[in-house]
Amino acid sequence: MITEIDASLLEKIADLTGKPVGAFNIRKDSGCEARQSTEHIAIDPQPEGKSGIIIRIKDGTKGEQCHIPVIISKSGVTEMVYNDFYVGENCDVDIVAGCGIHNSGCNESRHDGVHTFYVSKNSHVRYVEKHYGEGDGEGSRVMNPTTIVYLDEGASIQMETVQIRGIDSTVRKTKIVCGKDAEAVVTERLLTHGKQHAESDMEIELNGEDARGRVISRSVAQDESQQVFHPVVVGNSRCFGHVQCDSIIMGKAKIESIPAITANSTDAQLIHEAAIGKIAGDQLLKLQTLGLTEEEAEDTILKGFLA
C-alpha cells in the first residue's frame, strides 16, 4: 500500500504522481509494491537468492519509459539490490530510477544497489537517478549506488545522477566502457549539508575508435559536510574525453576534487578542468538590491548552479 509519505517520496525522486505509464517496478521496504511489463519492456525478478530485477528491452523499442524507483519508509531497513538491464539494438528509451528514504526512527536505513547496463548496437539510453532523504529520527540515511555500463558500437547513454538533500552518507561508484563510436555523457549534481559525507568514484574507458566521454560534475557543500570526487577518463584509442568539476563551498565544509585523465594512445584527446570556490559577493549583492534577503539570494544562486 502506498502511503502519503511514500507518494511524496515517489514524486521527489521519480516525478511520479499516481500510476506510472509504461513499464515500472516500485520497490518498497525491500519488497515489490507494484510491477508492470509492456509489449517491448519485460521486468522480471532476479533468480531466487538474489534481490533485484532483470529488465529486457526488445530490439527497436523507441519512445518508451521504464520507472524503477526504490522507497524506504521503515527505520532499520538495509538492503543490497542487483538490477540488470539488457537493451536490444536500435532502441531509444528513458529509464528513471532513484531512491528515497524516510527515516523517523533510531536505526540506520540503507540502500545499496548495483545497476548493470548492457546497451546493444546503435541504442540510446537516457538514465536518471535521484536520491533524497528525510525524516526527523536519529537513524542515518545511507545510499551506496554502483552503476556499470557496457556500450556496444554506436551506442550511447546520457546519465544524470542527482542527490537532492538528506543523505547522511553515500559512496557512488560508476564505470562505463565505450566501444567503437559509443558515447557516454554523465552529469552529476550533489548537495550536502550538516555533517554529511559523499564520495564519487567515476571511470569512463574509451576503448573503441572514435568513442566519446564527458563528465560534468556540479556540487554544493554546506555547513560541515565533506565531499570527495575522483572522475577518471581513460583513452585507449582514437577518442575524445572531457572532465569538468565545479563546486561551491560554504561554511566549514570540505571538498576534495581529483580529476584524472590517462591516454594510452597517441590519438586520444583528453581534457580535465576543476574549480572550487565560494559564492561571489557581487552576485549576492546584485540579488539583494532586487529585494531578496541574503538567504534568499544564496538559495537562488545555488538552485541555478545545480540546475
Positions of PLM-derived features:
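Conserved beta-strand/loop scaffold segments within soluble protein domains that form the structured core
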Residues: 23-28, 33-285, 289-292, 302-307
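C-terminal functional modules
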Residues: 1-25, 30
